[in-house]
């Protein structure tokens, strides 16, 4: 895993390598093991490397034999060994063992059609001097980030926004609608990025830059074509796909570890990883000094069962508050939860243990309907059909005991979930979340709210739904929304890629093997969610490899301390400054008066509810984000060009 950046232009002359060195410096955390540059006619690439496959021979940018095709690449193609054999049988000659070179030859052989053959997580750019084009692409589920902007006849692209801004050519301007999306959906909807004029390349798409224009094309679409399948056959297929997915993701020339929360999904991936590893598996987890959030006992039990060497990062005191500015710097977006902060600490623990690659369980909840949200859909539909049922309160209590008992008002929340949307609304499953999150908007300043007049991000989402969406069951519609609104732009990004790569750690996700997704998406929903029992088929299969208690353990939502983290004794000084009336006024997103009231309630302990927690985190993170990227951005000094592993000019190696 690495970081990439580049510029393609229709203007005469080559790209200044110094500009590329500035862009690369801004993302060097993604690739601490080396860096390189390419400057050709109308194009320039930068690359920072995290060496995992072919450690000695995988420096980038990399060319084909005659230098006409050049690539800068972030990610992993797990089936590169099989693709290499196919390409060699067609006459291609390889100089390295790295998957990067496989992409170069795959592009030569198949062009854009290569993407359907790749099993991996990737974002890359390929310069083709034969037709003066640049080809950019992103993996099916958006595991790896890629941003771009087209300005004044040039296309700029990079793994992170800060690399684009570090070029010196692009000004950071707040996109108000993007922030409104964060405060509705938890994240921006691709292609928005948070900054006006800069877009995220959407998952499952590629772009072709030629003649001063960038054209975006889709090569992969999520689909849920339910088919009947014999339960025994389904279990056997699941067994094969899970083992293949993990085995492929164990391919590396460095040790591979695993994140192990103690839950079902991470226990599965870690167990299979331990079986496939030639060495004792290193596993890692986080816990909290708050006993209500402490799952360390389950984590240790899981590690003992697997036989892994386990390390735990305990998060307490001011740990979240102290790292929060760094978290925002790497996330590059306002947040409404502190959940990425413990993941930042977890990645640091992993790096300090000498591990660069970890397998994790992300994707299982979306594929196998593991979230409470999916059960909530079933409960809400039942309660709307049976308004007089005495089971209604008990069903909600079973779903959200922590929400109903934390001072938020249990009866209020029961009424709220019942009144949030009609079953015929295509967004029925997610409207409660949207409405709870949108509570933040009452703190908008008058000017910011006025700038959003006439914009309804929820209605825009409704209008954007694909035709096939309306053929699916309600639960599959819910899964689609969860994957497109939360998995890629938040869980795999702010909480995933950004926190891991802040410390040069690569996360790999066996549940996001596209073959496993396509299998799970075609299963009847009843085999994934039976009554209120989530992940039914996954649990049945897991009995083969996990202790009975682990395979039966109910889903535990990942929660991190929020408001108390920022008002503990000896809290960092930046908090008071960021939340001061003068700072709030200068940023302009929120009302100083409204925020002052929220801060007083939070500081006094009167505001302990879910919504107040979200609002405080939203305000503080927005203040930090605006300061770091808009008001007072500071970028690292440019990388030393003479120290590069490779410098290519006009596709001819010169050093």
Question: What positions do the PLM features span?
Answer:
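A mobile, often basic/glycine-rich helix-loop segment
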Residues: 366-397
């Amino acid at each position: 895993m690495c970081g990439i950046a580049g510029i393609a232009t229709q203007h005469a002359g080559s790209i200044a390598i110094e500009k590329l060195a500035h862009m690369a410096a801004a993302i060097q955390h993604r690739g601490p093991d080396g860096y390189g540059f390419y400057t050709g006619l109308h194009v320039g690439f930068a690359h920072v490397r995290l060496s995992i496959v072919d450690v000695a021979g995988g420096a980038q940018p990399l060319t084909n034999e005659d230098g006409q095709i050049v690539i800068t690449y972030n990610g992993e193609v797990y089936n590169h060994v099989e693709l290499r054999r196919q390409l060699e049988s067609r006459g291609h000659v390889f100089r390295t063992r790295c998957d990067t070179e496989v992409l170069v030859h795959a592009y030569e052989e198949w062009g854009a059609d290569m993407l359907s053959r790749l099993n991996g997580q990737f974002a890359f750019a390929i310069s083709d001097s034969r037709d003066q084009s640049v080809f950019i692409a992103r993996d099916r589920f958006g595991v790896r980030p890629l941003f771009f902007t087209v300005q004044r006849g040039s296309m700029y692209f990079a793994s992170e926004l800060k690399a684009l801004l570090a070029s010196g050519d692009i000004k950071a301007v707040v996109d108000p609608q993007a922030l409104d999306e964060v405060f509705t959906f938890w994240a921006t909807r691709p292609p928005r990025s948070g900054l006006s004029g800069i877009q995220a390349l959407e998952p499952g798409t590629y772009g072709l830059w030629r003649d001063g224009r960038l054209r975006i094309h889709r090569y992969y679409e999520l689909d849920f074509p339910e088919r009947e399948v014999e339960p025994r056959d389904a279990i056997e297929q699941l067994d094969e796909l899970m083992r293949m997915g993990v085995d492929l993701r164990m391919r590396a020339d460095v040790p591979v570890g695993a994140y192990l929360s103690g839950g079902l999904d991470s226990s599965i991936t870690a167990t299979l990883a331990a079986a496939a590893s030639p060495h004792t598996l290193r596993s890692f987890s986080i816990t909290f000094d708050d006993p209500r959030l402490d799952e360390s006992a389950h984590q240790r039990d899981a590690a003992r069962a697997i036989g892994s060497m386990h390390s735990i990062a305990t998060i307490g005191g001011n740990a979240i508050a102290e790292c929060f500015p760094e978290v925002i710097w790497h996330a590059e977006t306002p947040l409404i939860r502190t959940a990425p902060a413990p993941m930042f600490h977890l990645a640091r623990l992993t790096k300090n243990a000498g591990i660069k690659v970890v397998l994790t369980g992300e994707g299982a909840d979306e594929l196998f309907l593991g979230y409470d949200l999916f059960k909530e859909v079933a409960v809400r539909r039942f309660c709307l059909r049976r308004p007089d049922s005495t089971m209604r309160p008990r069903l909600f209590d079973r779903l959200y005991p922590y929400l109903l008992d934390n001072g938020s008002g249990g009866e209020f929340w029961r009424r709220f979930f019942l009144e949030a949307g009609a079953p015929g609304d295509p967004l029925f499953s997610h409207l409660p979340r949207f409405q709870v999150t949108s509570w933040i908007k009452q703190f908008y300043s008058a000017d910011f709210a006025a700038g959003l007049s006439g914009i309804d991000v929820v209605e825009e989402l409704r209008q954007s739904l694909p035709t096939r969406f309306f053929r699916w069951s309600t639960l599959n519609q819910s899964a689609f929304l969860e994957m497109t609104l939360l998995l890629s732009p938040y869980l795999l990004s702010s909480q995933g890629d950004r926190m891991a790569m802040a410390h040069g750690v690569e996360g790999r996700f066996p549940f996001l093997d596209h073959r496993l997704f396509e299998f799970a998406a075609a299963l009847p929903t009843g085999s994934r969610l039976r009554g209120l029992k989530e992940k039914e088929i996954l649990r049945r299969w897991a009995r083969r490899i996990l202790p009975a208690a682990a395979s039966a353990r109910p889903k535990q939502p990942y929660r991190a301390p929020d408001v108390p983290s920022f008002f503990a004794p000896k809290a960092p000084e930046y908090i008071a400054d960021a939340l001061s009336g003068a700072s709030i006024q200068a940023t302009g997103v929120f009302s100083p008066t409204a925020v002052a009231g929220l801060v007083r309630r939070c500081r006094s302990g009167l505001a302990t509810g879910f919504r107040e927690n979200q609002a405080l985190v939203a305000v503080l993170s927005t203040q930090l984000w605006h300061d770091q990227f808009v008001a007072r951005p500071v970028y690292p000094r440019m990388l030393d060009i003479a120290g590069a592993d490779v410098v290519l000019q006009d596709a001819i190696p010169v050093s």
